[in-house]
Structures are given as structure tokens and as C-alpha cells.
């Protein structure tokens, strides 16, 4: 709810995008067939924290055309730092793509243009990522947590 309220208060698209992406993830990956929301998804798979979400530039270029890869890498920062407390070090050459909000603010066609350009690119990357070993899902459905999701 925090990102929704931040967007409503500031009108900054980076908060809107964050909220949209969270809801997309939740509805796609941690929602029960009957509509309940699962508790969580683990961070690690195959013995490495975050492995499911890590990419290399080579992987990006192997999946996308040159123009698509250049566009994706211009919008998404290469975040290879381990700023989250307790997170394992990310192996050399791997990174977690993090949207650079200023790249959207600077885009000529704004937020709508960004989503149009990224839709096909993200689908291609998602299809490849879905072939990886997924982290374990905690499929408990807790009433209080579900109430918060419904409120959001």
C-alpha cells in the first residue's frame, strides 16, 4: 500500500511502476487458484540466494535482439551490490535488473511508451526465467495478510 499512497501523494511514476510490478508478481506467482494470497516465496534456489532473478549481459543479449537488449539495459540499472543485510555476495558478471526511474522520467513518450516498449522484451526474459528452478513457495494463506492485500 505504501507505493500506492506515495504515487497518489507525489504523482511520481516510479511509485506507480513499483506498485504495478508488485501486484503483477503477486497475482501471477503467489495467488491461490481460489484467489487467496500465499505467504511468501523463498529467496534462494539451487543453493544460491536470488539465483532465480540473476542475469548476465550475455544472457540478456542471447534472449533479445541487439536493439531490445540495448533498450532494456538502458532502462534497467545493473545492480550487483549486496546492499540488503545478510544477502550473499552476487557472483561476478551477474546482476539484478533494477528499473532506473529517471530513465522513464527522461523518456520522450513517458510511462505509456515505456510499458509498450518493455512488454515484449519482458515477456521474452520472463519465458527464459520460467525455465529456471523456482524458489520454494510458502503456500500458507493467512487471513490477516490477505486482508492487507485486499485493502491495497
Give, region by region, the residue ranges found by the protein language model:
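Glycan-recognition and catalytic cores of secretory/periplasmic carbohydrate-active enzymes
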Residues: 1-152
Amino acid at each position: 500500500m505504501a507505493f500506492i499512497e506515495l504515487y497518489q501523494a507525489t504523482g511520481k511514476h516510479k511509485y506507480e511502476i513499483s506498485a504495478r510490478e508488485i501486484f503483477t508478481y503477486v497475482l501471477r506467482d503467489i495467488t491461490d487458484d481460489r484467489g487467496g494470497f500465499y505467504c511468501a516465496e523463498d529467496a534462494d534456489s539451487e543453493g544460491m540466494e536470488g539465483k532465480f532473478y540473476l542475469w548476465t549481459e550475455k544472457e540478456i543479449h542471447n534472449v533479445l535482439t541487439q536493439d531490445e537488449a540495448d533498450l532494456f539495459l538502458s532502462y534497467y540499472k545493473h545492480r550487483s551490490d549486496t546492499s540488503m543485510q545478510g544477502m550473499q555476495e552476487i557472483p561476478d558478471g551477474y546482476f539484478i535488473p533494477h528499473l532506473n526511474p529517471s530513465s522513464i522520467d527522461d523518456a520522450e513518450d513517458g510511462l505509456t511508451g515505456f510499458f509498450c516498449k518493455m512488454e515484449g522484451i519482458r515477456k521474452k526474459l520472463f519465458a527464459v526465467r520460467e525455465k529456471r528452478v523456482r524458489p520454494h513457495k510458502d503456500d500458507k494463506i493467512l487471513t490477516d495478510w490477505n486482508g492487507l492485500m485486499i485493502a491495497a
